[in-house]
């Protein structure tokens, strides 16, 4: 396919699972991921494509490092920004397909010159989380470098709306569906709660392209998305998440569409699927037809993997009968590894032999993986060396010098008896732990809960919290989950009547657990946003030796969630939520705390004497300073809206007294509201001079968005849609 296409051809560079930031702390492999991503972006510029389509997992970590974010932004800015005009005409309503502070396509922004737009969905590694439900793609979108689409706000009610693009006579409907937990999306498709929208004009002329990020194969009965669940009006599906490169499109005979699996651009696990040569694809769409040009990636580190069985391999025949055969077995295994290293180096040279640009490039160390099954007949034995020690023999020759070899025994039908006082692991978990290459946190949790039942804590949120703790490095995920679940159970039990309590609490606890489980599976229950409160740093604490004080577990005093409604005089009054700049709510909460505290504190003779002594002591002082001493803390709090609400409440409670009546907060000095009005008015005046809407571009002022409607599907189709709304335009 020529690099320059005709006026009716849309050229798209397709790539998935870049995993920028993978092994960035490894002294040898630290730069592999971003170098390959930079090569992909350079190919987009040199091949003169119209756009780049990324299928999720751009970053390896949910919270990418500054280095990873810097390298991605540098590569995007270097290769995707420029004066070359983008020939793609955007026909959708941007508010329907984009979210965030700038809900429009970046190459229509009058302040940014984008020559190659990048469209991306998120995967399971870079998915939204935390306060604000943001992800790394939101940062790239707000910087104008990426068009982040395919969000799934409700996992149990998914609406997939396309981005409508046109170049010449070719019309492209680009659908995106970001990653959802596989069991949940499988159930959502099964329950017919996924609706695809189609253009209302010239429906049959559009090339329908879908990109998603899910399990492609049945790892578990419901832990994947079947191709047959997708609607048959699609023309091509770009399948992310699977790392094996199967980039040649394959047609599904039942649905009629083609499926392309580009695979990852870097090996993140030492398995056979990662050893397939890595490619990216340039997809050329003309009308309703398409062509694929696959391009091998040159910066990928060569990877060779083998698996041998010592009992059947001719090179080890008879060694199991000899005593002290460890040295001989190690020697022959080293010869096999040397052959694999030579094979990997030859692969790299053959890929670069016709390239003049890479003559001065140093050949990288290869990735080598040798899986050895060393079980032997009864009465014989293969003695193998420690895998760490064996791998270190190849330091300076391989990139993975700590895990070159993996020894394992053949699984037998005999079961081991657990020692007294120790519980045996379930069979599935034991097998997963033995095969370290295929171990998965989700699989371990599911297998464990299949053998062990929970009485109070809900199972699905528990598994999600463990996954957040391990995969997303959220140190407080499990703690927050347990606190939320227990507090919900306690609140539910306190609301029970005496008759229900006498019947027994076990059934009610089980009912509450099922409700929490159901709410989580439907996406209604999320982990509460919490504000951490830290203790004061001890004197003499050395951050260089002991680390930052705020990162220590003993530094956290409490994790306070959003305040629950408090009762006042038999009436339920919701506690005020303190937000930055919300001064009225700040004082309202202080007043509310004072009232409730005063009511709860019992009045005794001792307290009355203390109050009288306090008033007598106060009377001896000057009256003006005494009044200011009460109002001063309020003034400081008003000036600093970022102060922790918990500290404010403690200060108010300490100063509270039974006989003291605080001044109502509504009698605040009038100049402060006046200043607030002025500060609010200034931004409005400035904002009228700046308009970042799509209509500012002169060439698009007369353009109208094409309406899209949900797909018309027959009654016996598995994707029956809800009735279309007549008054709403898409």
Curated annotation (Swiss-Prot):
Superkingdom of origin: Eukaryota
Chain residues that bind Mn(2+) 2: 57, 124, 213, 241
Key words of the record: Chromosome, DNA damage, DNA repair, Endonuclease, Exonuclease, Hydrolase, Manganese, Meiosis, Metal-binding, Nuclease, Nucleus, Telomere
Active site location: 125 (proton donor)
Gene Ontology BP, a term: telomere maintenance
Composition bias type Polar residues, residue spans: 685-704
Residues where Mn(2+) 1 binds: 17, 19, 57, 243
Cystines in this chain: none
Subcellular location: Nucleus; Chromosome, Telomere; Chromosome
Disordered, as annotated region: 521-730
Cellular component terms (Gene Ontology): chromosome, telomeric region; Mre11 complex; site of double-strand break
Principal location: nucleus
Compositional bias segments (type: Pro residues): 662-672
SUBUNIT field: Component of the MRN complex composed of two heterodimers RAD50 and MRE11 associated with a single NBS1.
Entry function: Core component of the MRN complex, which plays a central role in double-strand break (DSB) repair, DNA recombination, maintenance of telomere integrity and meiosis. The MRN complex is involved in the repair of DNA double-strand breaks (DSBs) via homologous recombination (HR), an error-free mechanism which primarily occurs during S and G2 phases. The complex (1) mediates the end resection of damaged DNA, which generates proper single-stranded DNA, a key initial steps in HR, and is (2) required for the recruitment of other repair factors and efficient activation of ATM and ATR upon DNA damage.
Protein name, as recorded: Double-strand break repair protein MRE11
Organism in which the protein naturally occurs: Chaetomium thermophilum (strain DSM 1495 / CBS 144.50 / IMI 039719) (Thermochaetoides thermophila)
Source lineage: Eukaryota, Fungi, Dikarya, Ascomycota, Pezizomycotina
């Amino acid at each position: 396919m020529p690099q320059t296409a005709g006026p009716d051809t849309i050229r798209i560079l397709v790539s998935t699972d870049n995993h920028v930031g993978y092994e960035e702390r490894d002294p040898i492999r630290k730069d592999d991921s971003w170098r390959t991503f930079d090569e992909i972006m350079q190919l987009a510029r040199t091949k003169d494509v119209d756009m780049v389509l990324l299928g999720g997992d751009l970053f390896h970590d949910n919270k990418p490092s500054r280095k990873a974010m810097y390298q991605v932004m540098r590569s995007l800015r270097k290769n995707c920004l420029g004066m070359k005009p983008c020939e793609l005409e955007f026909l959708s309503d941007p508010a329907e397909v984009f979210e965030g502070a700038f809900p429009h396509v970046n190459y229509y922004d009058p302040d940014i010159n984008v020559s190659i737009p990048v469209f991306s969905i998120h995967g399971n590694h870079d998915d939204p989380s935390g306060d604000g439900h943001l992800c790394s793609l939101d940062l790239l979108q707000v910087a104008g470098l990426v068009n982040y689409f395919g969000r799934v706000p409700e996992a149990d009610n998914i609406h997939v709306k396309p981005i409508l693009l046109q170049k010449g006579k070719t019309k492209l409907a680009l659908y995106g569906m970001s990653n959802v937990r596989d069991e949940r999306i499988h159930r959502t498709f099964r329950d017919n709660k996924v609706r695809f929208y189609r253009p209302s004009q010239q429906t049959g002329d559009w090339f329908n392209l879908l990109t998603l990020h899910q399990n492609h194969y049945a790892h578990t009965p419901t832990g994947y998305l079947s191709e047959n669940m997708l609607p048959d009006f699609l023309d091509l599906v770009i399948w992310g998440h699977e790392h094996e490169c199967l980039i040649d499109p394959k047609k599904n005979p039942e649905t009629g569409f083609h499926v392309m699996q580009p695979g990852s651009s870097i090996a993140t696990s030492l398995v056979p699927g990662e050893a397939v040569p890595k490619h990216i694809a340039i997809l050329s769409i003309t009308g309703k037809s398409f062509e694929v040009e696959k391009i091998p990636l040159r910066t990928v580190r060569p990877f060779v993997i083998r698996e041998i069985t010592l009992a059947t391999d001719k090179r080890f025949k008879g060694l199991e009968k000899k005593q002290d055969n460890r040295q001989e077995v190690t020697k022959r295994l080293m010869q096999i590894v040397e052959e694999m290293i030579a094979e990997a180096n030859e692969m790299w040279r053959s890929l670069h032999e016709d390239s003049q640009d890479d003559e001065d490039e140093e050949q990288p160390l290869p990735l080598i993986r040798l899986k050895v099954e060393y079980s032997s007949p009864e009465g014989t034995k293969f003695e193998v060396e420690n895998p760490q020690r064996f791998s270190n023999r190849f330091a300076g020759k391989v990139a993975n010098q700590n895990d070159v070899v993996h020894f394992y025994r053949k699984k037998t039908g005999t079961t081991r008896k657990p020692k007294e006082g120790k519980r045996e692991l379930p069979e599935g978990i034991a097998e997963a732990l033995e095969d370290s290459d295929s171990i998965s946190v989700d699989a371990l949790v599911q297998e464990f809960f299949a053998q062990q039942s929970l009485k109070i804590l809900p199972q699905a949120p528990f598994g999600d919290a463990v996954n957040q703790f391990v995969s997303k490095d959220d140190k407080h995920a499990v703690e927050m989950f347990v606190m939320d679940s227990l507090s919900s159970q306690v609140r539910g039990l306190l609301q029970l009547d005496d008759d229900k309590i006498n019947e027994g609490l076990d059934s009610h606890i089980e009912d509450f657990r099922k409700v929490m489980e159901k709410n989580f599976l439907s996406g209604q229950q999320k982990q509460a946003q919490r504000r951490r409160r830290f203790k004061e740093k001890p004197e003499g604490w050395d951050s260089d030796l002991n680390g930052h004080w705020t990162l220590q577990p003993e530094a956290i005093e409490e994790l306070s969630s959003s305040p629950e409604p408090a009762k006042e005089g038999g009436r339920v009054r919701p506690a005020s939520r303190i937000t930055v700049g919300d001064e009225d709510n700040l004082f309202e909460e202080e007043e509310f705390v004072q009232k409730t505290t005063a009511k709860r504190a019992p009045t005794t003779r001792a307290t009355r004497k203390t109050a009288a002594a306090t008033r007598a002591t106060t009377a001896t002082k000057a009256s003006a300073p005494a009044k200011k001493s009460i109002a001063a803390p309020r003034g400081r709090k008003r000036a600093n809206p970022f102060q922790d609400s918990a500290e404010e409440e403690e200060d108010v409670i300490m100063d509270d007294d039974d006989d003291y009546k605080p001044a109502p907060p509504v009698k605040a000095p009038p100049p402060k509201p006046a200043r607030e009005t002025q500060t609010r008015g200034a931004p409005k005046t400035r904002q009228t001079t700046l308009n970042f809407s799509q209509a500012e571009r002169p060439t698009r002022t007369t353009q109208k968005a094409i309406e899209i409607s949900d797909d018309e599907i027959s009654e016996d189709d598995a994707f029956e849609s809800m009735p279309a709304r007549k008054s709403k335009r898409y």
